[in-house]
Amino acid sequence: MTDFNAIDLDEGTSKGSPSPEKRDAEVQQLAKQYTQQSASSIYGQNPFCADAGSALDPNGDNFSARAWCKAMLQLQTEDDKAHPPRTLGVAFGNLNVHGFGSDTDYQKSVGNVWLQALGLLRKALPGQRQRKIDILHGLDGLVEAGEMLVVLGPPGSGCSTFLKTIAGETHGFYIDKASHLNYQGATAKHIANDFRGEAIYTAEVDVHFPRLTVGDTLFFAARARAPRHIPGGVTINEYAAHMRDVIMAMFGISHTRDTIIGNDFVRGVSGGERKRVTIAEASLSMAPLQCWDNSTRGLDSANAIEFCKTLRMQADINNTTACVSLYQAPQAAYDNFDKVLVLYKGRQIYFGPTATAKQYFLDMGFECPDRQTDADFLTSMTSPKERVVRPGSEHQVPHTPDEFAARWKDSTERARLLGAIEAYNAKFSDGQQLDKFRQSRRAQQAKIQRVSSPYTLSYTQQIQLCLWRGWLRLKADPSITISSLFGNSIVALILGSMFYDLNGDTSSFFQRGALLFFAVLINALGCGLEMLTLYAQRGIVEKHARYALYHPSSEAFASMLMDLPYKILNTIIFNLILYFMTNLRREAGAFFFFLFVNFILTLTMSMFFRSIASLTRTLVQALPAAAIFILGLTMYTGFAIPTDYMLGWAKWIRFINPINFGFESLMVNEFHNRDFPCVNFVPSGLGYADIGSGNQVCSTVGSVAGQGFVNGDAYVESLYDYTNSHKWRNVGIIFVFMIGLMFVYLAATELILEKRSKGEILVFRHGHSALTGKSHDDEEDAGGRTVAMAEKTESDDLAIIERQTAIVQWKDVCYDIKVGKENRRILDHIDGWVKPGTLTALMGVSGAGKTTLLDALATRTTMGVISGEILVDGKQRDESFQRKTGYAQQQDLHLSTSTVREALTFSAVLRQPAHVPRQEKVDYVTEVIKLLDMTEYADAVIGVPGEGLNVEQRKRLTIGVELAARPALLLFLDEPTSGLDSQTSWSILDLLDKLKKNGQAILCTIHQPSAMLFQRFDRLLFLKSGGQTVYFGDVGENSHILIDYFVRNGGRPCPPAANPAEWMLEVIGAAPGSHTDIDWFSTWRKSPEYARVQEHLQELKLERSQLTDLARTESGQKRQNKADYREFAAPFYEQLCEVQYRVFQQLWRSPMYIYSKTVLCSSSALFVGFSLFRSPNSIQGCQNQLFSIFMLLTIFGQLIQQIMPHFVAQRDLYEVRERPAKTYSWKAFMVSNILVELPWNSLMSLIMFLCWYYPVGLYRNAEPTDAVTLRGAQMWLFIWAFLLFSSTFAHFMIAAFDSAENAGNMGNLLYILCLLFCGVLATPDQFPGFWIFMYRVSPFTYLVSGMLGVGLANTHVTCAANEYLHFDPVNGSTCAEYMEAYRTTMGGYVLNGDATSDCSFCPMDDTNAYLATVSANYGDVWRNFGIMWVYIVFNAVAACALYWWVRVPKGKKEAVETGAGAEAQKKTQNGSA
């Protein structure tokens, strides 16, 4: 396995620490000579055919990236067919970038979101202009091919915008027309369109398919950019595999090749390794111009330096150009760059060689403190608090950004730069270089690819590659596919058994129609969950499109093809079971037509749902739209509302409904040219035994008097207006829909991008604004500190910090987890302690187990076995330990809708001891805000990255949330400076120093400390790979104690100017390119320092244990206050009140969620109501009113799909941050989330009632009974119960599942069963005996029965013209006389009672008779309502029970734990930092 630490980027020569003194000098010299000779002998070799173990073998330990690059370049140069290498420099002049909007925004809520709509309307009016916000002001610069530019500036200074502009990604902002960009003769338009993948921007976030392995992810990227002709005689797949191996070796991730990448919720590689995968993927684009935005975030300093060295090597050998923003740049990283750009609030204050940048500001009157890196010094110019002014120069130096920019514009350095830019523009003004660039690009592209296309592969090649990746993704995670197949098979079996062996007579007519209706719906609408999958991958696909790896539409087309086998298999299994179990038409042609129509309907509706997902930008937008369309497609299929009953205003819907055409074809396929014996004649029974056939008629629609059968064609034509001549015509129409929707889907994937953030803006609640302690001008006028200034005095705010006395110690701590069948040790016998008033650093390479150790000490592991001894004041930890410690996690996880003050107050109220008055807790929060300098944005909304708090503000809030809890024991911080610039990191350490001086005990992991930052720590716990201790002890002034230990044990001396934090990594062989033969773990265990640690641990244990026992003895009791030892500080009632208030507040501030629910409920109700507007009380009219209820229930699936993703987001926050901190219990979390839906569902039920009940006209049925008000109230209660049931059912489903998709599959299965067995599609007497229990347990049975009873009971029925049965009475009788006996027994009425021929008989005279046919009774209304509440309560209780059983960790943390909740944990799973 190739390790990142073993990669040699400098021709195989070692830059690591020397061997111990005992090593023979001659052996070193011989080894050096051998390495040089082997390096010089490989340049003529083919790198694809390198000898195993040579410097060109990426899978060997001797791999040299520099040697490989040179050999590859030589191979390309010697091959005439290879594309000539491309280079791309850039010159920019007067670069101005602006956006539109405001520096601050207000938070949208349910109450004020309409103000935004009014604002948008006002902006659309003529003469109204948006406010212009300048982002970059007049930048000039030149980065030639083969040069590297480092961009420095604090967050918000415009670094990201500059890099995006250079890479041609200008979404959301605009470049002024007067700006000039020259890419060696190409314009910005050329770069953005024709050469998109030649200039790439890599963001600092890591977005990948989590289930794919690292090797497959990088092979895909290499294959997508593989040139047409490959030198060296290898195939394109061999080329891609080799490039993958090389790039993995370069970035030290070869050992992760077969490990899935993972993400925050799926276990995979460590965070640092995932960052390197992102870097490697971008590098494989082979772009000649690369823009890297803080890509070293999450890497330790050694790997950050190695990243910069790799870019340097690529620039030297391949002439690539790199622009890199770095927030924390070690000196060794900074020295790799040629030029530096310093930005100060969007203004350029320096551009030029890195070697002279420092001197430029020194000459201006500033001073650089000792051991401060050049990059930190340059960035400090943008911070009035950090820049140091030389005594006597206070009035000469610039103070504000504008003054710095003006000083730059008047400088000789800028004049030289402008001259260089002018020469560059003149050099590339004739277009020759652009033509050469285009020719080189063309030589790399596939032959059939368009010349102007930014993509390398042809469209068909892209589809093939995406198909391969789709297959890998399916293999890696087949759970959704398998669960869908399983679920549909179960539904087919249930549906088949429900309609088992239908009779071949007229008694099965309605059942056959209902069966075909439900079958076509399940086939057509089963693809609805594809929307969730598409949204999950959208960000990844768009990133790859920016890298010009493939068209988004090619991935879309490939995913369609990839789903085909599943769709074919699903169609065959489902329809085969259904068709033959139910005794549908037993003819081969009819069966295969049935199969074929359902298959093309599945494909068509798949395109439909994919189109909705691609045309919308968020899932919240997509779900209501999908719900309305599904409702329309279902209602206008022709079964729920026959054609003759469709109202004129909506009749056109059936012509754009592919399901309508499919249903018609299936109905005529089943009924055409078949005669069905009649089983029910009118009149019949006692007194009618001897009448002739002409005196009675079959009771089925389409019958003819005197015939003992009903013709199938007559039936479907009379009832549905269907004809057999439309059978194949409809198939053609469905095909047209499928092709049309497919093109809509493919076009939408190319044209409509995912919603992106607006940029970093503060968001306040409406009516609130920023508070500033002092004016902006005052801050800038301060100009910086002087050398003579005394260190500023500590704030009185320190007095508020809880002074600690307890000592936390640990000895022989080990942590083992099970990987497969083997146990893997993550932590290996670690010792240490943290005392009050000390700041201890926990350091080590990525994967050394730093975060795992924090989790183990803080009792936050969710799996594995912890052994060893962890004590607090000599005693074992109790249940209250977790809430008495503060743990600031690396990920800044907060509720996005809360304000800063609210987040701090929530933590304080629930985590501080219960005996502290609430007002005192609130006052304490105000003091914490002052201490953390958050007053300016204390009332700002946290938001999401980009729209809300910036990185620094989030980090301060993360620390503040823990301080607000007043941790009594210890403060853990995991990477508090990760992603921050050096000045902000310094301010965070200032804060930690304040806390330390007031007695706070702090243990802090840190990745990239500068020498000055490192010096601020008192003690160091240093780990190596495998979780083994290398050193634990004091750091000492100028790190002399630490340095002395390593030098004394064989390490090379530390140069005076070196950063000890980087030097010690090199000494232990953990830095890339370094090597050591010393086993530093064994050295530590044998050292006198280790012995002293063991002695002191024993002393601490005895001393602190005795003091604790003495204190307890003096108090006269073992536990003075039981509340101090409880698991949670606040009692359950207080937890529930606080959490309930916050959850309700969150929904109020999530208007998209509430209004999407409102739109779904209101529009669905209106659509159903007006589609069946004032439905008459005919037989079919009663059926329509029944189906209006049934159709209203079909939004159930969309209701639960809205709730489940929302719940998952809340659960992740709770399980990752709030549950481990013991902020509140899982019971409060579950109950609050269930109860918060109640008021909104109450409101929705009222809206649904008004929008549906009155348009359908059900109130008219209550008028004859004088109970209009009562029955209206009863109907509202049932709708209310339906929405409450939907909400609690959604929580019941998602409680145990990790993803909304899997919960949705299970929910859909149960939902379909509820619909099947509710008595609408088949009455209870038609069920096989086995299934009658399902009718009784289906909640929809009581819902439909109750609503139908309330809506239809106790009124008259008047038959429609086609519902009257026509026959002649016996001779000598009137129609009334002839039907009297039958009517008395069976009901009904005669329209023309006095007639003696052609009697018109309606078989039903009141709605109660109709209710009896569907087993509904108005007398059961209150019983049914009560049963619905039983189901609601059951759902809520079951949701809580399931959550406890599956996701709540149980037992001691020191024992083997369940993996419940592990998917939500962001840390510890991998045992990596």
Curated annotation (Swiss-Prot):
Keywords: ATP-binding, Cell membrane, Glycoprotein, Membrane, Nucleotide-binding, Transmembrane, Transmembrane helix, Transport
Residues binding ATP, per UniProt: 844-851
Domain of life: Eukaryota
GO molecular function, one term: ATP hydrolysis activity
Topology relative to the membrane: Multi-pass membrane protein
SMART domains for the chain: AAA
Main localisation: membrane
Sites where a glycan is attached: 62, 294, 319, 1371, 1470
SUPFAM superfamilies attached to this UniProt entry: P-loop containing nucleoside triphosphate hydrolases (SSF52540)
GO annotation, cellular component aspect: plasma membrane
Transmembrane regions: 480-500, 514-534, 560-580, 589-609, 622-642, 733-753, 1153-1173, 1189-1209, 1234-1254, 1277-1297, 1312-1332, 1425-1445
One Pfam family recorded for the sequence: ABC_trans_N
Alphabetized PANTHER family for the sequence: ATP-BINDING CASSETTE TRANSPORTER
Function statement: ABC-type transporter; part of the gene cluster that mediates the biosynthesis of the sesterterpenes ophiobolins, fungal phytotoxins with potential anti-cancer activities. Acts as a specific transporter involved in ophiobolins secretion.
Protein name per UniProt: ABC-type transporter oblD
Organism: Emericella variicolor (Aspergillus stellatus)
